[in-house]
Amino acid sequence: MKFCRGWRGARAGQFARLLCVCWCSLGACSCVRESTERSGVVPISPSSQQKVLFVFGKKYSGHVYLVDCVERVCEAWRMRARVVEYGDLTRLSALPRMKVVLEAVHEMRPDAVVSLGLPVGGGKYLLAVKRERAQTLIVSLLPEEEVLPMQAGSDILVDFQVKEDSLEGVAEVSNTEAELQSLLRAACEIVRRRGVARRAHASPLQEFRGAFANVTDSLREQGVFSSDYAMECYVDPETGVRAYNHVLLSKRVETFRFVRSYGGSPGRSVHERDRM
């Protein structure tokens, strides 16, 4: 009987310790839950809340592979996307109505605007977006608009540098599908990172370089992308002023055809040469 009482006492002690452990665990969970409620933290990825407006200029509209690229990337990162193409800009007039972009921003209230080949006259509307919605990230790729309006209206402006030994009189740029998709994916990567970090932790040049490297490295592993690029900030040929948010790309691997020969002084961007 003494053995039984001792055994029962031991079991009772174990049960008491188990209750104590459970009570402490519940208390810790409630403290974590209370702390989460106080801080306003919601266990949902910020990228799932991001809305992105894409604007395609004349040269890049009507290409299914670009729209498919946007849809795949935004679906993978749970972004809501809307694409405004050149046909949407010219639906009511022969010339593009760039005000359509501003109207789309008012309607969608996007976290970011990504343009590819923005037509002439679009820069002032991007600047209007920045004035009305300073928190909206604007990434501009290969614009046809003048340099200064694009620099003023963009957080990150990306163009291709033209080499000094280019030929005069050629006014076209040859882009591959892989290159255009890489630019779009890099822009989306920047949008995603900004959504997580809430603000930039690097310069526009560093930010784009990192995003573009991630994209191209992934494509190289798939055997899709083979070119290598150097990047630098745009320098105004007349004043010598370096643009903080204007990134110029130039190929290190010349065998990969991308930019045809252009004339003019070195350091000027492709869309400047188009107007020469």
Curated annotation (Swiss-Prot):
Signal sequence, start to end: 1-28
Membrane topology field: Lipid-anchor
UniProt superkingdom: Bacteria
Species per Swiss-Prot/TrEMBL record: Treponema pallidum (strain Nichols)
A GO cellular component entry from the record: plasma membrane
Keyword set, alphabetical order: Cell membrane, Lipoprotein, Membrane, Palmitate, Signal
Residues covalently joined to lipid (N-palmitoyl cysteine): C29
Protein name: Uncharacterized lipoprotein TP_0938
Tagged with keyword Lipoprotein: yes
Localization: Cell membrane
Keyword Ligase: no
Lipidation (S-diacylglycerol cysteine): C29
